[in-house]
From Swiss-Prot:
Pathway: Amino-acid biosynthesis; L-asparagine biosynthesis; L-asparagine from L-aspartate (L-Gln route): step 1/1. The keyword Lyase does not apply. It catalyses: L-aspartate + L-glutamine + ATP + H2O = L-asparagine + L-glutamate + AMP + diphosphate + H(+). L-glutamine binds at R50, L51, S52, I53, V54, N75, G76, E77, D99. It comes from Escherichia coli (strain K12). The active site is at C2 (for gatase activity). This is Asparagine synthetase B [glutamine-hydrolyzing]. One of its GO terms (cellular component) is cytoplasm. Optimum pH is 6.5-8. ATP binds at L233, V273, S347, G348. Belongs to the asparagine synthetase family. Residues 2-186 form the Glutamine amidotransferase type-2 domain.
Length: 554
């Protein structure tokens, strides 16, 4: 992971602003501890903190075209960069081996309307000194975070994390996923549009399991490009186990040269985190034994988790209960992963949104409702699991890649017949995915019930969080919460506790508005609560809130 920081529409002293930009960019150096770079002129400033994974020696940023007239700062990975280099290499003189430099080639060729050509995860800021124009863009689902804000002079700031904007901006907001801002028309435009957003476009499709299986294998393989050691996050659940199995299949050869040479680090390392004796640790070890990975089991105590909560809220920049519950073990694990010399990991985020994997999907009344909920969940994922995976890992300088959210894979998986994703009546959640990959995994894992990450690390983790919140937040505080927190008013003591910490760390009203809210059961959207009368009486995002869970709340 890297970080970017940019200032545009400059109206104040550029020399002083450059100093300020360096100071604010430094707040995100945990994302990119390997190198720092800056471009500064009277009209634009671009700062970058680099985590070097591809082209370690020559890929420092900002990147420039040959004429030094186009400047680019990027946080991301472009998985189809080799194909784009081949296509544009006769018309653009590449200066580095960085995968991200293809953005400059595309801009030179097409102007601002090229973002859908990119397959990957990214957030970037590009400055064109010839036109005195800038282009800001974010990937299709917002896998990579990006925020924007304005100061009292009307100067525009962009940054990978809001902590770099809060000290200087009057207002901030999340830069929309799947969108770009081109300064010459001044509008934020959405570029990510798919036919599968509409149920009618997919309802009569025929599901091809072979195509689905191959699409995921292709996605994982493309995500393996790396010039540094990498690993896999292996919780022992279906999604991370599938990603680990496919990664193991290709890890012995370098994908960068079409598998002509041996991988520089042929032994695949896997990582699991949990309280001692937790459900995830046992299942993860079983998968690791089956696949033959070098497995690392990372333990944490409830007290260690509690001690990390404030740091987690600072790094994840949220007060969302589910996100904080799940981010804390991930944050602790990331520190150990970095200590072992690993700089990139593959993870299983996104599968539950694509395939209707959360336990509340058992209550989906029909295929149309299920499909529409999966689309809602995917388009909102930048506020939840994408933020968690990205920021919890980058807090310690580790990059998380998410093959289930690959754009090409989504175009296959979201076009299969939604009826084939329905669960209940004897069918397990994500049964179509299980059927595709059951040969890759032990049967006990291929058909293991969905366990949310915050539950799977150990049930006592969430139970203790609730107990601590009950001790620290009074009944009166919760009853009067609407006066202190009129926006996204906390509805539980746990939520109140997190919100209190968040407001201390980010004391800007618009910062709180960057965090999602609303009722949820087992990670559902507010809309899906209408599926079951019992949901309307609950307000707990744990999977144990749904009766089909084997350890459901009584």
């Amino acid at each position: 992971m890297c970080s970017i920081f940019g200032v545009f529409d400059i109206k104040t002293d550029a020399v002083e602003l450059r100093k300020k930009a360096l100071e604010l960019s430094r707040l995100m150096r945990h994302r990119g501890p390997d190198w720092s770079g800056i471009y500064a002129s009277d009209n634009a400033i671009l700062a970058h903190e680099r985590l070097s994974i591809v082209d370690v020696n020559a890929g420092a940023q900002p990147l420039y075209n040959q004429q030094k007239t186009h400047v680019l700062a990027v946080n991301g990975e472009i998985y189809n960069h080799q194909a784009l280099r081949a296509e544009y290499g006769d018309r653009y003189q590449f200066q580095t081996g960085s995968d991200c430099e293809v953005i400059l080639a595309l801009y030179q060729e097409k102007g601002p309307e090229f973002l859908d050509d990119l397959q990957g995860m990214f957030a970037f800021a590009l400055y064109d000194s010839e036109k005195d124009a800038y282009l800001i863009g974010r990937d299709h689902l917002g896998i990579i975070p990006l925020y924007m804000g304005y100061d009292e002079h009307g100067q525009l700031y962009v940054a990978s994390e809001m902590k770099a904007l809060v000290p200087v901006c009057r207002t901030i907001k999340e830069f929309p996923a799947g969108s770009y801002l081109w300064s010459q028309d001044g509008e934020i435009r959405s570029y990510y549009h798919r036919d599968w957003f509409d149920y009618d476009a997919v309802k009569d499709n025929v599901t091809d399991k072979n195509e689905l299986r191959q699409a995921l294998e292709d996605s994982v393989k493309s995500h393996l490009m790396s010039d540094v050691p990498y690993g896999v996050l292996l919780s022992g659940g279906l999604d991370s186990s599938i990603i680990s199995a496919i990664t193991k299949k290709y890890a012995a050869r370098r994908v960068e040269d079409q598998e002509r040479s041996e991988a520089w680090w042929p032994q695949l390392h896997s990582f699991a985190v949990g309280l001692p004796g937790s459900p995830d640790l046992k299942a993860a070890q079983e998968v690791a034994n089956h696949l033959g990975t070098v497995h690392h089991e990372i333990h944490f105590t409830v007290q260690e988790g509690l001690d990390a909560i404030r740091d987690v809220i600072y790094h994840i920049e949220t007060y969302d209960v589910t996100t904080i519950r799940a981010s804390t073990p991930m944050y602790l694990m990331s520190r150990k992963i970095k200590a072992m010399g690993i700089k990139m990991v593959l993870s299983g985020e996104g599968s539950d949104e694509v395939f209707g994997g959360y336990l509340y999907f058992h209550k989906a009344p029909n295929a149309k409702e299920l499909h529409e909920e999966t689309v809602r969940k995917l388009l909102a994922l930048h506020m939840y699991d994408c933020a968690r995976a990205n920021k919890a890992m980058s807090a310690w300088g580790v990059e998380a890649r998410v093959p289930f959210l690959d754009k090409k894979f989504l175009d296959v998986a979201m076009r299969i017949n939604p009826q084939d994703k329905m669960c209940g009546n004897g069918k397990m959640e994500k049964h179509i995915l299980r059927e595709c990959f059951e040969a890759y995994l032990p049967a006990s894992v291929a058909w293991r019930q969905k366990e949310q990450f915050s539950d799977g690390v150990g049930y006592s983790w969430i139970d203790t969080l609730k107990e601590v919140a009950a001790q620290q937040v009074s009944d009166q505080q919760l009853e009067t919460a609407r006066f202190r927190f009129p926006y996204n008013t906390p509805t539980s003591k746990e939520a109140y506790l997190y919100r209190e910490i968040f407001e201390e760390l980010f004391p800007l009203p618009s910062a709180a508005e960057c965090v999602p809210g609303g009722p949820s059961v087992a990670c559902s959207s507010a809309k899906a609560i209408e599926w079951d009368e019992a949901f309307k009486k609950m307000d707990d995002p744990s999977g144990r809130a749904v009766g089909v869970h084997q350890s459901a709340y009584k």
